[in-house]
From Swiss-Prot:
Coiled coil: none annotated. One of its GO terms (biological process) is DNA-templated transcription. HAMAP family: RNApol_bact_RpoZ. Gene3D superfamilies: 3.90.940.10. SUPFAM superfamilies: RPB6/omega subunit-like. The keyword Transcription applies. Keywords: DNA-directed RNA polymerase, Nucleotidyltransferase, Transcription, Transferase. One of its GO terms (molecular function) is DNA binding. InterPro entries: DNA-dir_RNA_pol_omega, Pol_omega/Rpo6/RPB6, RPB6/omega-like_sf. This is DNA-directed RNA polymerase subunit omega. The gene is rpoZ. It comes from Albidiferax ferrireducens (strain ATCC BAA-621 / DSM 15236 / T118) (Rhodoferax ferrireducens).
Length: 67
């Protein structure tokens, strides 16, 4: 499987800071048992980035973060 890069994800979420926040929150969700939206047998952080690069996850992740 090809390596995932930040540039692949920046096409979906152009702001690097928002990208990191969305990927972090999604990785936490995956580690707590949520189902991945892409076929991936990697760690939660890599899976979250793959989901973002595939367009399955976007900025809506930031709206789900509890304050």
């Amino acid at each position: 499987m090809a390596r995932i890069t930040v540039e692949d994800c920046l096409e979906q979420i152009p702001n690097r800071f928002q990208l990191v926040l969305a990927a972090t929150y999604r990785a936490r969700m995956l580690s707590q048992g949520h189902a991945p939206k892409v076929d991936c047998k990697n760690k939660p952080a890599v899976t979250a980035l793959r989901e973002i690069a595939a367009g399955k996850i976007g900025l809506e992740m930031l709206k789900k973060v509890p304050l």
